[in-house]
Amino acid sequence: MSSGGLLLLLGLLTLWAELTPVSGKKRPDFCYLPADTGPCMANFPRFYYDSASKKCKKFTYGGCHGNANNFETREECRKKCFASAARRPT
């Protein structure tokens, strides 16, 4: 095989390795919990992972209790639930 062919193969394998882990990992169970404002009456803007739409969505958190599907930023939500997986844990 020529050096150009090897370089192309190496590039394709690198691309495949970068894309494969996203679909091979499992989402944490808390990513499947519904948004939970909790019983308190504060108004904190937060984000939760909506497993039906597969998106991080904004909601208002009351400030206490709730659940672990509660993130201060959309980026944090994506890091924990969106980018880490493509299928629900079994």
UniProtKB/Swiss-Prot annotation:
Residue(s) at site: Reactive bond for chymotrypsin: 41-42
Tissue-specific expression: Expressed by the venom gland.
Cellular component aspect of the GO annotation: extracellular space
Domain BPTI/Kunitz inhibitor stretches: 31-81
Pfam families in alphabetical order: Kunitz_BPTI (PF00014)
Superkingdom classification of source: Eukaryota
PANTHER family listed in its UniProt record: KUNITZ-TYPE PROTEASE INHIBITOR-RELATED, TISSUE FACTOR PATHWAY INHIBITOR
Protein name as it appears in the record: Kunitz-type serine protease inhibitor bitisilin-2
Species: Bitis gabonica
